[in-house]
Regions:
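Short loop/edge segments at beta-strand edges and connector loops
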Residues: 17, 70, 104-106, 152-154, ...
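A short, glycine/Asx- and small/polar-enriched loop/turn
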Residues: 29, 81-85, 112-119, 160-167, ...
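Glycine-rich active-site loop/strand segments that organize a redox cofactor
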Residues: 23-53, 64-68, 108, 257-292
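Dinucleotide-binding Rossmann-like beta1-alpha1 core, especially the glycine-rich loop
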Residues: 33-108, 112, 118, 237-238, ...
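Flavin-dependent oxidoreductases
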Residues: 159-268
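Helical element adjacent to the flavin cofactor pocket in flavoenzyme catalytic cores
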Residues: 122-179, 183-190
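Glycine-rich FAD pyrophosphate-binding loop
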Residues: 5-29
Length: 293
């Protein structure tokens, strides 16, 4: 929305947010890491957008006075098998032009993280942390400043065509648009279905659970410490993450959520769960990764 108004200042842009405030879900419920582009296949869209996104995010944070802490990241190998995987990651990182990335010995990694230990590590000094809630609010402020509208509490319950236009029904009434862009996060497939579009890729909700280090133990972690990821699984593994507010997270795991917005074990929405269990792709995923639990 912000970019559209920059390119087309005469456009009338409206953002519909179903919650009463911004960043209530994925945007505000992550570890706050700004990844540098280490893991992605060189030349892929993910790699390209990651590096471009880092540049744009730094500019936005500087403009709005949002703290952008370049704390750095270590990916630590503990044995020879992991060391081989680590060197493959290093090759990817250099191909993706990640700034300053290098391999460090076990002794050198202790200079960076005195309380860490390992055989070898990949050091990415440009990896950063940021408050993504503040980022979302800054983007919304620019949309409003550019003449756009950001409406909270505007859950879209119906989409229908009316001639060449699209009509969106919300609790406050109907809104008519010439064009509609769906960016609905965990509900992306269901909102796409409302629009009559292909709902693939389908959403299977997983919840990541973290521990917090006690305040008197936070000094043990200066930046970000990750394991070498297992390429057989679609997760980066349990890691140590310093946040923008000074807290240090340990995690996450990845457990099947019983609701799309299921942030605790007791949150169960039968419609969401039934949708997951009825989709054949979920069972393919389960068969492929059942050993992880």
């Amino acid at each position: 929305a912000r970019r559209l108004l920059q390119v087309r200042p005469d456009a009338r842009v409206t953002v519909l947010e179903k919650e009463e405030a911004l960043a209530r879900h994925q945007t505000g419920r992550n570890s706050g890491v700004v990844h540098a582009g280490i893991y992605y296949v060189p030349g892929s869209l993910k790699a390209t957008l990651c590096r471009r996104g880092v540049s744009l995010l730094k500019e936005l944070c500087a403009t709005h006075g949002i703290a952008y802490e370049t704390c750095g990241k270590l990916i630590v190998a503990f044995d020879e098998e992991e060391r081989a995987k680590l060197r493959n990651l290093y090759e990817r990182a250099t191909a993706n032009q990640v700034p300053g990335v290098r391999l460090v010995s076990g002794a050198e990694l202790r200079d960076i993280e005195p309380h860490a230990a390992g055989l070898e590590a990949l050091h990415s000094p440009s990896t950063a942390i940021v408050d993504f809630v503040a980022v979302a609010e800054a983007l919304a402020s620019e949309v409003r400043a550019g003449g756009g509208d950001v409406r909270t509490g505007a859950r879209v319950t119906q989409l229908k065509a009316r001639g060449t236009q699209v009509v969106a029904r919300t609790p406050s009434g109907e809104l008519t648009f010439d064009h509609l862009v769906i960016c609905a996060g965990l509900h992306g497939d269901s909102v796409a279905r409302l629009a009559g579009a292909n709902p693939d890729p389908r959403i299977v909700p997983f919840r990541g659970e973290y521990y917090l280090l006690r305040p008197e133990r936070r000094h043990l972690v200066k930046g970000l410490i990750y394991p070498v990821p297992d390429p057989r699984y679609p997760f980066l593994g349990v890691h140590l993450t310093r946040r923008h507010d000074g807290e240090v997270l340990v995690g996450p795991n990845a457990v099947l959520a019983l609701a799309r917005e299921g942030y605790g074990w007791r949150t169960v929405r039968l419609g969401d769960l039934a949708g997951t269990l009825a989709w054949p792709g979920f069972w393919q995923l389960a068969r492929a990764h059942w050993q992880m639990g």
